[in-house]
């Protein structure tokens, strides 16, 4: 991981924790925690921001902390934050694709060490479901799912995974990938 990403993750984690914003890293940056390691430049983050007022306050605090959100709108499920210091972009999801975004999801996220920072990452079960439930799911997403199933075998909460997969309408594809 480059020093720019390490710096960004450290400052982002401090900002979110300091402002008591529940969050979790999702997408490709979460994958090495549970599955295959592959290169990705996308930093996707889900933040628990439930009202327009919370959103407005978040944007103000983010800009004070060095993150710019030029096209921010609470009505959009995702927006881009740009870090002034590194120029790197963060996709901030208010309503992430493929994840039932609720208290149970937050309770199941895991704290993982990234470089010098402890950050929250989506649970392996919710990672799997989110990859399968994406409207633009591709072969790489299915490979990512398989790598997590193999690496985390014996530690995944199968009952929770299958319940969430059924709710998202992806239980059949999960079972097919699991058999491969």
Predicted regions span which residues?
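Compositionally biased terminal segments of proteins
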Residues: 1-180
């Amino acid at each position: 991981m480059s020093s720019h990403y390490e710096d960004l993750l450290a400052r982002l984690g401090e900002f979110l924790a300091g402002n008591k914003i529940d969050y979790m890293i999702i997408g490709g940056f979460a994958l090495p925690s549970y599955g295959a390691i592959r290169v990705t430049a996308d930093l996707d983050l889900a933040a628990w921001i439930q009202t327009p007022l919370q959103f407005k306050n978040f944007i103000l605090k983010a800009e004070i902390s060095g993150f710019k959100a030029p096209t921010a709108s609470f009505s959009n499920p995702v927006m881009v934050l740009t870090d002034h210091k590194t120029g790197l972009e963060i996709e901030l999801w208010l309503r992430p694709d493929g994840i039932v975004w609720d208290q149970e999801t937050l309770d199941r996220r895991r704290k993982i060490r990234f470089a010098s920072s402890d950050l929250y990452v989506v649970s392996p079960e919710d990672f799997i479901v989110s990859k399968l439930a994406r409207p633009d799911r591709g072969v790489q997403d299915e490979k990512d799912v398989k790598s997590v199933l193999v690496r985390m075998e014996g530690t995944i909460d199968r009952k929770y995974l299958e319940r969430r997969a059924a709710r998202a309408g992806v239980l059949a594809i999960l079972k097919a990938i699991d058999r491969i």
